[in-house]
Design a protein with these regions (language model features):
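His/Asp/Glu-rich metal-coordinating catalytic cores
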Residues: 1-12, 17-230, 249-263, 282-286
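Hard-cation-handling environments
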Residues: 143-383
């Protein structure tokens, strides 16, 4: 990137998850170009820029779904999607040789928490106009069927809250999953409980989302963690970080007895509302075991359906292919096995295998109106 800095017109974000925005403060220190993203995405990014004392030195442009931004010879169009974070978008990149659609991380949720369904009509319209290349999320390409709606988790929360009338409830989830946090708050409000937030990233995310009106917190529901001592256990819900067993997270410190404000009590109901990111299984098991040894009642994915994925399964991926009808297809966002599975899915729908490109890291795909081909490589690896 630094070698081609004169060619870079801007950085375009699809959503505010850590793996999509976490490196930006470091990149922007060397390549200071405008950043484009939706309101919540930029709000979460600004928390990071503030920590790096870079707020004043970076240019940020807020976009809304449906908006188009001209960058050099290309026009980038933002399309509303559903994901495990609010304000996610796909990109339709209008180039001189044709339209490239990048789905970003997405799922098709017909009953999303905010009521805003993925803009399937726009994908279909682009398909009719002609899509040169589709780049589509492959994370769940191995999984059959459809991904469940986020609303399903809310129903499980309500069931667990109803079954826990006397004990304190803690919920660990990803701090960026605003819709999941909203459902915890909804259940707490329904059962007359106060909500306290712990974990730096969780506190920041809740503050940002509520200030930008992506999170509705009923009046007198949110309390400071230090106020919890003034309430009975049956009046409390604590939302925390640490769903992946991260060593320094709030839940890990609670489990090890090192948290300054919260200690585990016998029969605390602790809900881990997330699936294990590959590689984190041992860390999560360690935390669960410690909590169980202290007498807590721990609920996780193998016990209740308290998590749904933010990524499309096979039927949703087939729908995206059917709507956009791309001339060429490049599966993205997944390991090689996920990309290969996505390729086979496209072949099963009638695409020519020669028009599908499963790329290795660093390979360059060159596309024009008539053909697509791998033309070389660029250096990749740890920095």
């Amino acid at each position: 990137l630094t070698k081609n800095i004169d060619k870079i017109k801007g950085i375009v974000l699809t959503h505010g998850h850590e793996d999509h925005i976490g490196a930006l403060p470091y990149i922007l220190k060397q390549i200071n170009v405008p950043v484009f993203g939706t309101l919540l995405t930029l709000g979460l990014l600004e928390n990071k820029l503030r920590e790096h004392k870079m707020l004043d030195s970076t240019t940020r442009h807020t976009v809304v779904p449906g908006e188009k931004v001209k960058l050099g010879q290309m026009v980038v169009e933002f399309i509303h999607t559903n994901h495990s974070i609010a304000d996610a978008v796909a990109l339709a990149i209008h180039t001189p040789v044709g339209v490239v659609v990048h789905t970003g991380d997405f799922k098709v949720d017909y009953t999303p928490i905010d009521g805003d369904v993925i803009d399937l009509q726009r994908f279909a319209a682009l398909g009719k106009e002609g899509v040169l290349l589709l780049m589509s999320d492959s994370t769940n390409a191995e999984r059959r069927g459809f991904t469940m709606s986020e609303k399903n988790v809310g129903k499980v929360f309500e069931k667990i809250f109803e079954e826990t009338p006397k004990n304190r409830i803690m919920v660990a989830t990803f701090s960026s999953n605003i819709h999941r946090i909203q459902q915890v708050i909804n259940a707490a409000y329904m059962y007359g409980r106060k909500v306290a937030i712990i974990g730096r990233s969780m506190v920041n995310a809740v503050k940002t989302a509520s200030e930008l009106d992506y999170l509705w917190i009923p009046p007198r529901t949110l309390i400071d963690i230090n106020e919890t001592r003034n309430y009975r256990d049956d009046q409390l819900v604590i939302i925390t970080t640490g769903s992946q067993g991260e060593t320094m997270s709030a839940l890990s410190r609670i489990a090890s007895g090192e948290h300054k404000q919260i200690n585990v009590k016998p029969d605390d109901k602790i809900i881990i509302s997330a699936s294990a990111i590959p590689g984190n299984e041992k860390s999560i098991s360690r935390v669960v075991n410690e909590l169980l040894k202290k007498g807590a009642n721990v609920v996780y994915g193998d016990i209740e359906d308290i998590h749904v994925s933010g990524h499309a399964r096979q039927e949703e991926l087939k729908l995206m292919l059917a709507l956009t009808k791309p001339k060429f297809f490049m599966p993205v966002h997944g390991e090689f096995m996920h990309l290969s599975c996505h390729k086979n899915l496209a072949i099963s729908m009638g695409m020519d295998k020669n028009d599908i490109f499963v790329m290795k890291l660093g390979e360059v795909l060159e596309v024009n109106k008539n053909e697509a081909k791998v033309t070389g490589t660029v250096p990749v690896g740890q920095i």
